[in-house]
């Protein structure tokens, strides 16, 4: 066993290295130091690195992204070089601001654009032709091609999860998984997307997200969705395809919304939505009146009908007469 490990790995002061002559397919490697992947790893294999206080954990598996050589000089033959600030890999056609940080273990593909003060953490893959605005922080994340990430976005940070132990102390739950973002996704400024705890947080292809949106851990969002500003989606919620959420819509945790649902602004989803259609209110209910603008109750709906039927000049005259009569002495 020891001899086979020596043929597979070599150890130096810089970490644990996979020998170039080795043709083994490594599935899981647990190491206490950084692991550098050499050129003999098969193509279309990605690295998922989970760091802890005790040791680093690296899992290798198939993915849509190429695993790139991360030797000290980069992989010049494939057009990839090592970024001087952080040691991450980037394609020579990518445009990266000099103040950006690309950590070791991150990969930036061709024609990507990274703005000023961008921080790309380890275990991150930036797809082709992705545009990332200034002051953005991304880690533990896989971003597809042709995505647009606006200023100040945070992707891949810890999710919000705590529990009380036997001693009454508040203990943080481990948040060790990743965020997966599809192709042609646009994310507005100052939006936050948490990484998963028991499953990856996923955003489907062609989904568009406005500014100041919060997406919790373990959330799964389908393709071609539209989220307006200040939407909040709690952890472990599931949203189907072609779903539109108006401004300040709130979705509680562990609920499911089917495809082709539209939610009016300021609505709150407290239970599963199983039928396509238009919803609104608190809690959200399905719109049944064709002319109603999600009236809060029947009286408000009837008053709206009366106001539509009365001419505006007559309505104003009645208001003035009522004000005059109220001022008259008895």
From Swiss-Prot:
GO terms for molecular function: N-acyltransferase activity; UDP-3-O-(R-3-hydroxymyristoyl)-glucosamine N-acyltransferase activity. Keywords: Acyltransferase, Lipid A biosynthesis, Lipid biosynthesis, Lipid metabolism, Mitochondrion, Transferase, Transit peptide. The keyword Acyltransferase applies. GO terms for cellular component: membrane; mitochondrion. It is an enzyme of class 2 (transferase). Pathway: Glycolipid biosynthesis; lipid IV(A) biosynthesis; lipid IV(A) from (3R)-3-hydroxytetradecanoyl-[acyl-carrier-protein] and UDP-N-acetyl-alpha-D-glucosamine: step 3/6. UDP-N-acetyl-alpha-D-glucosamine binds at residues 160-162, 218, 236, 254. Its main location: mitochondrion. GO terms for biological process: lipid A biosynthetic process; lipid X metabolic process. PROSITE patterns: HEXAPEP_TRANSFERASES (PS00101). Its EC number is 2.3.1.191. It catalyses: a UDP-3-O-[(3R)-3-hydroxyacyl]-alpha-D-glucosamine + a (3R)-hydroxyacyl-[ACP] = a UDP-2-N,3-O-bis[(3R)-3-hydroxyacyl]-alpha-D-glucosamine + holo-[ACP] + H(+). It is found in: Mitochondrion. Hexadecanoate binds at residues 210, 214. It comes from the Eukaryota. Pfam families: Hexapep. Disruption phenotype: No visible phenotype under normal growth conditions, but plants lacking LPXD1 accumulate very low levels of 2,3-diacylglucosamine-1-phosphate. The record marks 9 as: Participates in a stacking interaction with the uracil ring of UDP-GlcNAc. Residues 1-52 form a transit peptide. The keyword Transit peptide applies. The active site is at 217 (proton acceptor). Belongs to the transferase hexapeptide repeat family. LpxD subfamily. PANTHER family: UDP-3-O-ACYLGLUCOSAMINE N-ACYLTRANSFERASE (PTHR43378), UDP-3-O-ACYLGLUCOSAMINE N-ACYLTRANSFERASE 1, MITOCHONDRIAL-RELATED (PTHR43378:SF2). Homotrimer. Involved in the biosynthesis of lipid A, a phosphorylated glycolipid that in bacteria anchors the lipopolysaccharide to the outer membrane of the cell. Lipid A-like molecules in plants may serve as structural components of the outer membranes of mitochondria and/or chloroplasts, or may be involved in signal transduction or plant defense responses. This is Probable UDP-3-O-acylglucosamine N-acyltransferase 1, mitochondrial. The lineage of its organism: Eukaryota, Viridiplantae, Streptophyta, Embryophyta, Tracheophyta. The gene is LPXD1.
């Amino acid at each position: 066993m020891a001899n086979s490990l020596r043929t597979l790995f070599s150890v130096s002061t810089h970490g644990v290295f996979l020998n170039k002559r080795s043709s083994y397919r490594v599935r899981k490697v647990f190491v206490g130091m950084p692991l550098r992947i050499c050129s003999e790893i098969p193509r279309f294999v990605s690295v998922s690195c989970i760091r802890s206080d005790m040791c680093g954990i690296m899992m290798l598996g198939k993915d849509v992204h190429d695993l790139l050589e991360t030797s000290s000089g980069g992989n010049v033959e494939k057009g990839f070089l090592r970024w001087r600030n952080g040691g991450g890999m980037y394609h020579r056609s990518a445009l990266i601001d000099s103040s950006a940080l690309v950590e070791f273990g991150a990969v930036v593909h061709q024609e990507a654009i990274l703005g000023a003060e961008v921080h790309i953490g380890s275990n991150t893959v930036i797809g082709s032709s992705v545009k990332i605005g200034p002051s953005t922080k991304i880690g533990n994340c896989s971003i597809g091609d042709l995505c647009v990430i606006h200023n100040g976005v945070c992707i891949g940070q810890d999710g919000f999860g705590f529990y009380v132990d036997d001693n009454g102390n508040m203990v943080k739950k481990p948040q060790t998984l990743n965020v997966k973002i599809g192709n042609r996704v646009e994310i507005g400024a100052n939006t936050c997307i948490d990484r998963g705890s028991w499953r990856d947080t996923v955003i489907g292809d062609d989904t568009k997200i406005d500014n100041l949106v919060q997406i919790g851990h373990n959330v799964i969002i389908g393709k071609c969705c539209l989220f307006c500003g200040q939407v909040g989606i709690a952890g472990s919620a599931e949203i189907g395809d072609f779903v539109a959420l108006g401004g300040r819509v709130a979705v509680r945790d562990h609920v499911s919304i089917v495809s082709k649902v539209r939610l009016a602004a300021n609505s709150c989803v407290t239970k599963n939505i199983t039928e396509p259609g238009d919803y609104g209110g608190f809690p959200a209910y399905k719109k049944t009146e064709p002319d109603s603008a999600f009236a809060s109750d029947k009286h408000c709906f009837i008053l709206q009908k009366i106001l539509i039927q009365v001419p505006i000049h007559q309505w104003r005259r009645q208001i003035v007469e009522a004000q005059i009569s109220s001022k008259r002495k008895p």
